[in-house]
A protein has these predicted regions:
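Glycine-rich phosphate/diphosphate-binding loops that line cofactor/substrate pockets in enzymes
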Residues: 120-132
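Short, Lys/Arg-enriched, disordered terminal segments
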Residues: 1-11, 285-290
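HTH-adjacent hinge/linker in prokaryotic transcriptional regulators
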Residues: 2-6, 15-18, 22, 32-36, ...
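A short, charged, Gly/Pro-tolerant segment at domain boundaries
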Residues: 263-290
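Glycine-rich phosphate-binding loops that contact phosphosugars or nucleotide phosphates
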Residues: 130-248, 252-261
């Protein structure tokens, strides 16, 4: 993918102005750095104006510089080591107003997720979950928190949910080896993508299960063999993976399947409320507590 974009820029070099050629050469040689530069900073770095950078972006086929920047970021996200992420964070964030910067970026991720995820694809994924004999959920490393959140609520909606855990490939396959054609397998992973999750999806697909991938782009290795692709933006804001948009998407999926099973969910919660009350699970708001 990176080669395609850089190749296209290189191929179109002859039709560029002198200043635009400077930008093109810099991006080809330093695309990992250029991906996180503003148009102004990139212009200053190569010695051209900000407007020249903007014109360059449109010249190479993008609506504007932000779209070119996003494309470059997409190309390198899975390549950055933790050390490189820390360096990028330092350059992007600085030490001031971090709260505002991070929350603003997360808001943008949710907005883009809503724009890019089709409602039809989302509803189809929800329907397949409702129809499943068994529901397997897998998320590894930082995605484990997402898988646990989904499993917690799905267990209150369905009797047939299996959260796949384990610190090794052997443990993982021991838990999913019975997955079959009437089951749904949900794999969750974001850059840097988990090899175990990809292998598990391959296995589930070979066994005839319906595969739902929750990931960041159609270029993700999870997308290749899934039946339903649910996309959530997790563009790197720092060395910490942003799970805000993925969690919002999963939250919506939980609500969607819950609304399709309102009667059953209502009965389940009525029983749970009795158990919670009988076994004093939650703190009660009592008056005159000293």
């Amino acid at each position: 993918m990176a080669k395609d974009l850089l190749h296209n820029i290189s191929e179109g070099m002859s039709g560029l102005s002198k200043g635009q050629k400077l930008i093109a050469r810099y991006i080809i040689e330093n695309y990992d750095k250029a991906a996180f530069m503003t148009a102004s900073k990139l212009g200053n770095t190569v010695g051209v104006s900000e407007s020249t950078v903007v014109r360059f972006a449109t010249e190479v086929g993008f609506e504007g510089y932000p779209q070119l920047q996003r494309a470059l970021q997409e190309l390198i996200r899975n390549r950055l080591t933790a050390v490189q992420r820390m360096e990028v964070t330092s350059e992007q964030m600085g030490e001031h107003d971090i709260l505002s910067k991070v929350l603003t970026m997360d808001i943008e991720k949710i907005r883009r997720t809503l724009e890019e995820q089709s409602n039809e694809g989302f509803e189809a994924a929800a329907d397949s979950i409702i129809a499943a004999k068994n529901i397997y959920i897998l998320g590894i490393r930082s995605s484990a928190a997402l898988a646990q959140f989904m499993s917690f609520y799905f267990n209150q909606i369905f009797p047939n949910v299996r959260l796949v855990t384990g610190s090794s490939a052997s443990e993982m396959f021991e838990q999913i080896f019975r997955v079959g054609k009437d089951d749904v397998f949900i794999g969750i992973s974001f850059p840097r993508y988990s090899k175990r999750t990809v292998k598990a999806i391959d296995y589930a697909k070979e066994r005839g299960a319906t595969v739902i991938a929750i990931t960041d782009s159609a270029g993700s290795p999870l997308a290749a063999k899934c039946d339903h692709l649910l996309l959530a933006r997790s563009d790197m804001a720092s060395f910490v993976d942003s799970l805000v948009a993925p969690l919002s998407l999963i939250n919506a999926l939980i609500v969607a399947v819950g609304m399709r099973r309102q009667k059953e969910v209502g009965e389940t919660y009525a029983q749970l409320e009795k158990i919670w009350d009988e076994y004093d699970v939650y703190e009660k708001n009592e008056e005159n507590i000293v």
